[in-house]
Amino acid sequence: MTDLTTLEADVLAQVAAAGDLAALDAVRVSALGKTGRVSGLLKTLGAMSPDERKERGAAINVLRDRVQTALNDKKAALETAALDARLASETLDLTLPAPRRRKGSVHPTMQTMDEMVAIFAEMGFAVAEGPDIEDDFHNFTALNFPPKHPAREMHDTFFFNPAKNEDGSDGERMLLRTHTSPVQVRTMLSQKPPIRIIAPGRTYRCDNDATHTPVFHQVEGLVIDKAIHMGHLKWTLETFLARFFETDAVKTQFRPHHFPFTEPSAETDVQCDRSGGEIKVGQGTSWLEILGCGMVHPNVLRACGIDPDEYQGFAFGMGVDRLGMLKYGMPDLRDMWSSDGRWLAHYGFSAFAAPNAASGLS
């Protein structure tokens, strides 16, 4: 067994002398690899008698276990030393100031919508919501749109391909809502008057220029009750606009217009100053259209199961993005969705500045 003792001493000396993991692995291969010095001893057992093979084999296994244990211990020691060296080279100076991280901000559109909701909530309106994907009835038919109305065409509305029925025929064609008016329809179908709601949310149309985007945001309002008239509508809008622009100097004018879902219908303008490349609401001699409104058409009331001889109502709709542009001086609507961090840093709002009518909107 003298040869085994000598071999063990030699291999363990090589293990102890290994200065890194690569050198240690070379020792492992030379000793325990397929052609290694310890592994080679096992090949000599076949020429021995059973008794010799038993005694010699046990001794070789003991040698192999000792070498493997030494290798494992040395590997752990080398890894610990390497980690200690790395940590020593990566020490942190805790007296240095922490790196500044850029703060996120609330998008102007979301801030504007929150401001609008806060004002209408103070005026007694509840918030109603509905799906972005709508059917023809809720988006058009119930709102008194004629069958051949241009809004029903592909150039103005985003339609989905119709699903197939079991017989292979085309099913109903769904669409992305072109306004939040379907929320009004769903509310009238599910609730009895009196109704006083606003419907904020995303809407979609095939439009893209400096003042229009394919995806935009609206806040629509609906009031249904007995003896409702245009005077109630006018007071509601003028009160809202004065609160939103935070000035009592806001002047409005109502121009006759046509909407399928209201009769009479009007567009509302605010007086403004366009000089100096900036629009200032509440001063000047110019007028700017900002919303549409009117008395709910009797056909819409009937489609929703409400008797127009007993109940009347008014509705209005305004673009959140455009109102935000006017209030905060943003020149191009498309910049809102350009994902430009510099623009958002300039026009964004603190997440802790949630608007409410009591403490101020902005």
UniProtKB/Swiss-Prot annotation:
Lineage, uppermost ranks: Bacteria, Pseudomonadati, Pseudomonadota, Alphaproteobacteria, Caulobacterales
Record EC number: 6.1.1.20
Subcellular location: Cytoplasm
Cofactor(s) this protein cannot do without: Mg(2+)
Chief location of this protein within or outside the cell: cytoplasm
PROSITE patterns referenced in this protein's UniProt entry, alphabetically: AA_TRNA_LIGASE_II
Listed InterPro entries: aa-tRNA-synth_II (IPR006195), aa-tRNA-synth_II/BPL/LPL (IPR045864), Phe-tRNA-synth_IIc_asu (IPR004529), Phe-tRNA_ligase_II_N (IPR004188), Phe_tRNA_ligase_alpha1_bac (IPR022911), Phenylalanyl-tRNA_Synthase (IPR002319), tRNA-bd_arm (IPR010978)
Name of protein: Phenylalanine--tRNA ligase alpha subunit
